[in-house]
């Protein structure tokens, strides 16, 4: 995060001293295409200055005797930023990192440019991993915890580079000076990394997720003909993760080539992968590791699908509220099928969806007519 300007040709714009060295506010462009703008004293950076690196990243702070000292901000080429404490040009001390959306993604310390001690790594979905990093700055050890978005429910145990190996259910009880304290349930089952494949939905199919189990349950849907549905076990505010959507991982081509009757529990994860909960795993007696596939469709949903990095299942999707929900309220999402056959704005709609959409339009038209009258 610094420019190695030794033995480099440079072009100086600004005042020079009697030895033709930068002296005062100058702009120095190096042969590497890196550029520095700031204050110099007889050829050495002294005072406020900023590096503009060839890859689009920048480094800004206060220089003393040619080295960055104290608070500095390194901005990545994608707009993310690292705010840290520098000693003689190297990160040594507390630091925070933010992604390009301004969300906190790291909180902890650095030593000689490497993450050090107790560190927190945050995911955009609201969860985090916390623990003492190893000598390489990796979240590896036997006393690391994954903390769910509620900030309390946790899996505490062994991780390698932030990935779950095995852990027990725990509760984050207190924090003191950035150091968490957990109470581990000695009777908890062991949770392990259990990412699905194209043929295996999970190794431990009947092991419920502890966070999800506190928030939802499956019951008879209030929607006519929908079968089972997903319900809130407790009140929840808007933007709350309620359930997870894990399944086997198949391709879009496979989904598109088969009959619609086989696609009742499919959801697109990304441009390459579709998550599917096929029979018999659509029944909770055969699979209950995640329950997100039980959420039914509504044109007036109270939830949405969102990306989620799960400690057991890896990159999946979750069910997240878009408004406050009451205890025992059915959780619904918009499936996002294409309403127009020629539109191709989303997956082609099955017959039941098209029928429900027409009925919804008729109801909305009726409401509009009543309001006009």
Swiss-Prot record:
Q: Which InterPro entries match?
A: Hist-Lys_N-MeTrfase_SETD7, MORN, SET_dom, SET_dom_sf, SETD7_N, SETD7_SET
Q: Which GO terms describe its molecular function?
A: histone H3 methyltransferase activity; histone H3K4 monomethyltransferase activity; histone methyltransferase activity; protein-lysine N-methyltransferase activity
Protein keywords: Activator, Chromatin regulator, Chromosome, Methyltransferase, Nucleus, Repeat, S-adenosyl-L-methionine, Transcription, Transcription regulation, Transferase
Enumerate the spans annotated as SET domain.
214-336
Kindly state which reaction or reactions the protein catalyses: L-lysyl(4)-[histone H3] + S-adenosyl-L-methionine = N(6)-methyl-L-lysyl(4)-[histone H3] + S-adenosyl-L-homocysteine + H(+); L-lysyl-[protein] + S-adenosyl-L-methionine = N(6)-methyl-L-lysyl-[protein] + S-adenosyl-L-homocysteine + H(+)
Q: Does the keyword DNA-binding apply?
A: no
Q: What residues bind S-adenosyl-L-methionine, as annotated? A: 226-228, 296-297
Gene Ontology cellular-component terms listed: chromosome; nucleus
Query: Enzyme class, one word?
Result: transferase
In residue terms, where are the MORN repeats?
A: 36-58, 59-81, 106-128
Q: What is its main location?
A: nucleus
Q: Where is this site: Histone H3K4 binding?
A: 245, 256, 266, 317, 335
Keyword S-adenosyl-L-methionine found: yes
User: EC number(s) for this protein?
Assistant: 2.1.1.364
Compartments in which it is found: Nucleus; Chromosome
Q: Which Gene Ontology biological process is one annotated for this entry? A: peptidyl-lysine monomethylation
Entry comment, domain topic: The SET domain is necessary but not sufficient for histone methyltransferase activity.
User: What protein family is recorded?
Assistant: Belongs to the class V-like SAM-binding methyltransferase superfamily. Histone-lysine methyltransferase family. SET7 subfamily.
Per its database record, what is this protein's job? Histone methyltransferase that specifically monomethylates 'Lys-4' of histone H3. H3 'Lys-4' methylation represents a specific tag for epigenetic transcriptional activation. Plays a central role in the transcriptional activation of genes. Also has methyltransferase activity toward non-histone proteins.
Protein name, UniProt field: Histone-lysine N-methyltransferase SETD7
Instruction: State the species of origin.
Output: Danio rerio
Taxonomic lineage: Eukaryota, Metazoa, Chordata, Craniata, Vertebrata
Please state the gene responsible for encoding this protein. setd7
């Amino acid at each position: 995060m610094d420019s190695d300007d030794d033995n480099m040709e440079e072009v100086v714009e600004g005042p020079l001293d009697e030895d033709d060295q930068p002296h005062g506010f100058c702009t120095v462009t190096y042969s590497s295409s890196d550029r520095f703008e700031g204050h110099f004293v007889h050829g050495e950076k002294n005072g406020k200055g900023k590096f503009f690196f060839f890859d689009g990243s920048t480094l800004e702070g206060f220089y003393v005797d040619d080295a960055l000292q104290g608070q500095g901000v390194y901005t990545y080429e994608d707009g993310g930023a690292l705010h840290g404490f520098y000693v003689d040009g190297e990160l040594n001390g507390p630091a925070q990192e933010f992604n390009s959306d301004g969300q906190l993604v790291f909180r902890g310390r650095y030593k000689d440019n490497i993450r050090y001690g107790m560190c927190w790594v945050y995911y955009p979905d609201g969860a985090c991993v916390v623990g003492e990093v190893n000598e390489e700055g990796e979240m590896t050890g036997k006393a690391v915890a994954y903390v769910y978005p509620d900030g309390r429910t946790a899996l505490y145990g062994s991780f390698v580079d932030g990935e779950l190996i095995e852990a027990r259910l725990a509760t984050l009880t207190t924090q003191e000076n950035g150091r968490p304290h957990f109470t581990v349930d000695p009777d908890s089952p062991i949770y392990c990394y259990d990412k699905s494949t194209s043929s295996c939905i999970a190794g431990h199919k009947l092991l419920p997720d502890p966070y999800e189990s506190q928030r939802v349950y499956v019951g008879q849907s209030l929607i006519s003909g929908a079968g089972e549905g997903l319900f809130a076990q407790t009140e929840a505010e808007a933007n709350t993760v309620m359930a997870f959507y894990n399944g086997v991982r198949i391709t879009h081509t496979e989904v598109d080539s088969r009959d619609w009757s086989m696609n009742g529990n499919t959801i697109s994860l990304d441009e390459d992968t579709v998550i599917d909960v096929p029979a018999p795993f659509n029944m909770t007696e055969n699979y209950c590791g995640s329950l997100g596939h039980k959420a039914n469709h509504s044109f007036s949903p109270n939830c949405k699908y969102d990306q989620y990095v799960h400690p057991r299942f890896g990159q999946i999707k979750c069910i997240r509220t878009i408004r406050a929900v009451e205890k025992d309220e059915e959780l619904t999402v918009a499936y996002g099928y294409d309403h127009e056959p020629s539109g191709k704005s989303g997956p082609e709609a099955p017959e039941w969806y098209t029928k429900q959409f027409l009925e919804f339009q008729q109801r909305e038209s009726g409401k509009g007519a009543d309001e006009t009258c």
